[in-house]
Design a protein with these regions (language model features):
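N-terminal small/glycine-rich loop or linker at the start of catalytic domains
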Residues: 239-251, 345-354
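N-terminal accessory segment at the very beginning of proteins
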Residues: 3, 17-235, 239-244, 251-253, ...
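Sec-dependent N-terminal signal peptides
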Residues: 4-14
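Enrichment for repetitive, rod-forming helical segments
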Residues: 9-11, 143, 454
Length: 559
């Protein structure tokens, strides 16, 4: 099938003759065909930026590519030929054909065709109070190659050949629109709206709901690891975590006082079981009207500075604290946010209101309250929960999409356009503010992610999953795929978050010997995950809850 441009207008557009413009100084060329401007830019010898922009549209600045990247080709030449226009680097040949109006990417050294466009189309729509394009780009893949990445999903898919996936954020689903091939190239699809990917007999297709243009990066490498290295060069390198982040994280939903939390740490030390981090989950702020007040409840979490100093000085353990993007109506920060007009008026499952993190004023207010109420008390690491952001029914992709879109426009545009990047903005806010305070390395755990988020010192986990063997198995493919998108730090709730719920295989929890064996296997798997962490609800996760010295499960957890 030839590359075609489909337009659904009420007006008729005259097709322009194909013409080309080349600029070797800027390492790019542009061609104009069928009212589309196609721009091909050489960022380095293995990273090529492709934009296809309809007449009258203007693309927006990328949120994922670094604004001041140091990318530069060692060699780039642009030339016309009988077939069209070619761009040569030391590693690649990028060709535009005037016959089918498609771009192909070839390994210049071996002469092997790596990837070829097949078709693209644009459909005019009115979405989110603006006139936008639905966009579609189809690529031709070779029969033998496998493709990975795209994020973390719960279907148990490893290789996306012949598969369809919805790139939508949800409680247990994480989006990163970066695809990587066993033929040592990747495609970074630079769009933040609802996106679908499908590979079938017609080709490999990216489709997005809201766009001004088709915008993607072709990223090659000498091997798959080098492809990811080039992805990091484009979107940001991964900062080094503090050494403690690579130790064991003890967590559960939840410790109800500093006394309980400190007793758990003391018991780990008494039993001489290694522990580097203790985690305080939600409701340290008190009841629901005080949701995420960004300060400690004075009844059960009194004298926080002294309590945290004790964890540091006496037990040599670090504290991670859960913070959310929404606030209860009885909190000071809610009143400040409401007065500034930076809260979304969309109902949530716990009655809080979510802030518009895209608004600089919201980010300023959030940090000012967090710094005074929590950071200055000595908290070491930050668990940013529900950063999809969570409204209601957040475990279901379509419901999460619906609630987000109905929340109204964001500061920078419609939620339809910026559907998937809430967590990227949250992470940027936290990381940049933390780095301005001191020279300590940053650790942020967040439930959602997007391309480029790795540059903000974040790890991710797979959400509120259920205790079943098939769910456990699906975490392996989900974790491997998200890590192959260049986000290397990922983990799960050891033993699953929900153990006694209706969908669990182990409704008796700890009373079921089968669950204790199940937990052991998952705990062992987490020991070899990038982040070694236990967490969940209903069933406590301290090692001694599963047996005593001499018991097979207890001893297995320690070995």
């Amino acid at each position: 099938m030839k590359c075609q441009f489909f337009f659904f207008f009420s007006l008729f557009f005259l097709l322009q003759p194909v013409k080309g413009e080349m600029d070797s100084n800027r390492q790019l060329f542009q061609v104009y065909a069928d009212s589309i401007k196609i721009t091909v830019s050489c960022l380095n010898d293995q990273i090529i930026h492709v934009q296809a922009t309809p007449e009258g549209s203007v693309g927006k600045e990328s949120l994922v590519a670094l604004k001041n990247h140091a990318l530069k080709p060692t060699f780039c030449s642009v030339q016309k030929n009988e077939e069209g226009i070619s761009m040569l680097t030391s590693k690649l040949t990028i060709s535009y054909s005037t016959t089918d109006k498609c771009i192909s990417f070839t390994d210049r050294i071996s002469g092997e065709l790596l990837l070829k466009e097949k078709m693209r189309d644009f459909v005019r729509q009115h979405i989110g109070e603006e006139d936008v394009w639905n966009i579609r780009q189809v690529f031709s893949l070779t029969p033998e190659e496998a493709i990975y990445g795209l994020g973390q999903y719960q279907e148990g898919v490893m290789n996306y050949r012949g598969k369809k996936v919805k790139l939508l954020q949800a409680n247990k689903d994480i989006v990163n629109p970066f695809l990587i091939s066993t033929r040592s190239y990747g495609i970074l699809w630079d769009n933040y709206s609802k996106t679908l990917f499908e590979d079938n007999e017609h080709g490999a297709t990216f489709w997005s709901e809201v766009a001004d243009e088709i915008n993607y990066y072709f990223i090659a490498g000498d091997n798959m690891d080098k492809v990811i290295a080039n992805y990091h060069a484009l979107t940001g390198k991964v900062p080094m975590f503090p050494k403690s982040a690579f130790g064991y994280w003890q967590s559960k939903e939840r410790y109800k006082s500093f006394d309980e939390l400190t007793e758990v740490v003391a018991e780990y030390r008494r039993r001489q079981i290694p522990l580097d981090n203790i985690v305080q989950d939600w409701e340290y702020w008190g009841d629901r009207p005080f949701w995420n007040s960004l300060k400690f409840d004075t009844l059960h979490f009194n004298h926080p500075k002294e309590a945290i100093d004790c964890l540091h000085d006496q037990y040599h353990v670090k504290l991670m604290l859960s913070v959310w993007p929404g606030f209860g109506k009885e909190t000071d920060i809610y009143r400040a946010m409401d007065s500034a007009g930076v809260l979304f008026d969309e109902p949530t499952w716990a009655g809080y209101k979510v802030m518009d993190v895209y608004n600089p004023k919201a980010r300023e207010i959030f940090w000012s309250y967090l710094q005074k109420g929590l950071f200055d008390k000595g908290v070491d690491a930050w668990w940013m929960d529900a950063t999809e952001p969570s409204f209601r029914d957040g475990a279901i992709q379509e419901k999460q999409e619906e609630r987000s879109k109905s929340a109204g426009p964001t500061y920078i545009g419609s939620f339809h356009r910026y559907l998937s990047v809430y967590s990227l903005f949250m992470s940027e806010m936290m990381y940049n503010n933390l780095r301005m305070q001191n020279d300590k390395r940053v650790f942020i755990l967040t439930r959602s992610a997007f391309a480029g988020q790795q540059r903000y010192g974040t790890a991710i986990w797979s959400g509120d999953i259920t205790a079943r063997w098939d769910v456990f198995r699906h975490q392996i493919s989900g974790g491997l795929n998200i890590c192959m998108t260049g986000i290397p730090y990922w983990t799960t709730d050891a033993g699953a978050f929900s153990v006694t719920g209706k969908d669990s295989e182990f409704k008796q929890g700890l009373a079921d010997p089968a669950y204790r064996k199940f937990y052991l296997r998952w705990f062992q798997q987490n020991a070899f995950s990038p982040i070694f962490r236990a967490h969940g609800t209903s069933v406590p996760r301290e090692v001694w809850q599963f047996g005593q010295p001499g018991d097979s499960i207890y001893e297995g957890l320690l070995k």
